Every structure is written in C-alpha cells, then in structure tokens.
A protein has these predicted regions:
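Non-heme Fe(II)/2-oxoglutarate
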Residues: 1-91
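Asparagine-centered strand-capping/turn motif at beta-strand->loop junctions
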Residues: 161-165
Length: 183
C-alpha cells in the first residue's frame, strides 16, 4: 500500500490506556480553555460522535481565522498527565505538533474527509491504535486496525474510519514535521 504504511504492530499500549482511564476528565477538556487563540467548534454547525482528548491543539491568531491555516500549537493541561504516550513518541520523533486521542463509539464512522489547510502541507500524520478494532480507508486502500498498531497515512487524500469492534475505539492521532528520517 502506498497511502497507508504500517510501521509496527503488537505495541504494548496498556500503560497508555491506563493513563487515559485514570484521567476521564481530560476528554473534551479543551472546551474549557478560555483563550482567544483557540478556535472552538460551533455546536449548532457540527454533529460530533467522536470525543477528543487533545494534548497539543491548533490555535488561531485572530477571530475568524481557520485553524488549519496556522502553525500555532498549544499544549493543553492534559499534556503533562499522559506521559506514557509521550514516551512512545520520543522513541520515533524529535518533534511532534498537534496530537489527540480520539474515541469512536461501536458501529460509528468518521466520514471520508481530507485534512485541509496550509498547516498539513508540511506534516506527516500518524495513528497509534490504543483500543478497539476499526476499518481505516485512505483513497482506495483499506486496512483493519488492531490495538497496538502504529501507522502513517496520506491525510492529503480522502480518509475515514469505521469502528467494527465491540468496544469504543481509541486511537492517538498526531502530526510530525516532514523529515526524511520519519518512519
């Protein structure tokens, strides 16, 4: 496959999951950050079944600016609590940018979409599957993802997910600046 590249499978993610369970208050906590640099989704415009636990989120310089067109990255208070996933990241990358845990209920989908904006033009995007089984599609390629799978994908193509397991899917999605040594 050229649009999905599995880097490693069978990673022990139990300590990462344990920290997520220790801090349930972190899910959606970015909504409580009162900072004009942080763009909040308008609940009247978006229906969201995915829950988000952001560690580093995008920001804006001025009201009305699209977060996908800025390089601003802001650590959330949750960042310091999730040390196990940060340890994992340091084994592969010197620098990471925006990153978050995403949950998806059983049977739900994340519809096919492209990550748009100038921010994404210089980033590689990855998943580390933490819990649940899901079908992941990028362009015309599809794979089944099990917990402990670490992969890169081309987020400049349409991509989406479907939770085909029997528990909530949790995956860690993160960006790293393009680099020839990236996995």
């Amino acid at each position: 496959m050229k649009n999905i590249r599995v880097i490693k499978t069978g990673i022990d993610v139990s300590k990462i999951l344990e920290q997520i369970k220790e801090h349930p208050e972190d899910w959606g906590s970015q909504k409580n950050i009162k900072d004009k640099k942080i763009e909040q989704l308008d609940p009247t415009k978006y229906t969201v079944t995915v829950d988000v636990l952001q560690l580093i989120m995008g920001g804006i310089e001025k009201e009305g600016q699209y977060v996908g067109d800025t390089e601003i990255c802001i650590q959330t208070p949750a960042y310091k609590k999730h040390t196990e996933v940060l340890k994992f990241l340091k084994t592969y990358f010197k620098k990471i940018r925006r990153c978050a845990f995403l949950s998806l209920p059983v049977g739900e989908i994340v519809g096919s979409h492209i990550d748009e904006g100038t921010y994404y033009l210089t980033k590689d995007r990855y998943h580390l599957s933490i819990q649940g089984k899901y079908r992941y599609s990028v362009g015309d390629e599809t794979m089944i993802v099990e917990p402990g799978t670490f992969f890169w994908f081309n987020n400049k193509l349409p991509h989406g997910a479907e939770n085909i397991g029997d528990e909530v899917r949790i995956t860690f999605v993160f960006d790293a600046p393009h680099h020839k040594r990236n996995p």
